[in-house]
Structures are given as structure tokens and as C-alpha cells.
Amino acid sequence: TLLFSACGMTANTVSSPVEPTVKSNEKTAVNNKALVYFSKDISPVSLIKLYDKINQDIHGKVAIKIHTGEKNGPNILPREIVMALQQHVPDSNLVETNTFYKGDRYTTAGHRETLKVNGWDFCTVAIMDEEGAVMLPVKGGNHFQEMSIAKNMLNYDSMLVLTHFKGHTM
């Protein structure tokens, strides 16, 4: 199942990704809930249709955050749908972060090699923490007054996150 989520004013369900249908009239502004779209069609056309439903607040330079997987790993998003989406989103490129655990993606050099092996070389892939981290203030934060983020995140105006459910521990 392809799941797409975004914050917005209404909660809609896509029953058919080719011709999306609104199934709910619940107001997310009142309930502070995110929109969640589902599709059983995992294809470039489906992902682009879902993106087109939520892209009204995505602007400027766009980071498309993906999980690129370990070398030759089985848990990799289908590259053809990511490639189609990236080509559809103006002024976008893929972004990723190095892993906290030791492995193929622990260093930027190792990560770049893994990107090539796994076929993520069809566009620029920025390693967000390649130049370290930066502390940003959290306005009105209840638990944190500042947070550490990957420094290269400051180079983007919007971020679209594509992920998969892994079901494994770190």
C-alpha cells in the first residue's frame, strides 16, 4: 500500500489514485489531524497523483528525503517511482542523512558509494549532515527550546519525505 500524508484543511481518502475521490468531510483544522491518502497502486502515476493533491504548500528548492538502503539491500523504495516523482517536482533533488550506526552509510564517502550501487545516481543526492549539524530554536516548544538538525537542511525551502516501514530494530 502506498501511503501519502500531509497537513491540510480537510481529511480526504484517495480510493483510486488515477481519479482521486474525496471520502470524508472531517476538518483537520479543528481536530489538528494530518491528511492521509492510501493507494494500493504502487506506481509512478499513483505517487504523482497523490503528490499533486498535497503540493500546495511545497515551494522553492525542494528536498525529497528518502531512505536509500544498505548496499544491495532488499528494503529500498522502488527507484522508478522516486525518479518519476523527482522529475515531476520542480527544483528538487533527493536528500539523505548518514546513519548513526556503523555500516555502509556511516560516512559520507561510504554513503555515496552505496548510492551508486543501489541506483540512486539519476539526480543529485545531497547528504544533509555532510557538513555537520546546526541548532535551531523551537518556537513555543513545550519540551525543547532548540533542536539539532542536519546543516544542509538550511539549503531547502520545502521537504517531501518518502519512507517505508522497516519493522526492524536499530
Predicted regions and their residues:
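N-terminal and secondary-structure boundary signal
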Residues: C7-M170
